[in-house]
Amino acid sequence: PVAAIEEHLVELRVVPGPRDDWLVDPDALVHTIWMASNRSDRVGMRLQGRPLQHRWPDRQLPGEGVTRGAIQVPPNGLPVILGPDHPITGSYPVVGVITDEDIDKVAQIRPGQYVRLHWARPRSRLPGQGVTQAW
């Protein structure tokens, strides 16, 4: 069992990708303090805060299978952390996945509680998105 979360701010680690490049500023996901919506359920925890901007708002992805903890960003720009009863993606990009170590915390988060996401490892960057790593 996971210990009850007493803090008002819950910290969650996120593995970047696979489609974080579909956001204008993927790091905005981890630079925003989100609030858990009262519209959350076993399908997903909806986050409220400053909407993320899609890089290609007119493009759609085919539906894809995902795992519990995947973070998809629908057209309104407000992330949804998918829960145990999640469907396929519904054409929305998955920009990260909550780490295995933190996934059980998601079920403990109450509506109105604040959530801060952190990259669990550095993001891969596309050319033109800042520093790239040479191999």
Positions of PLM-derived features:
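Conserved "landmark" site that anchors the functional core of diverse proteins
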Residues: P1-W135
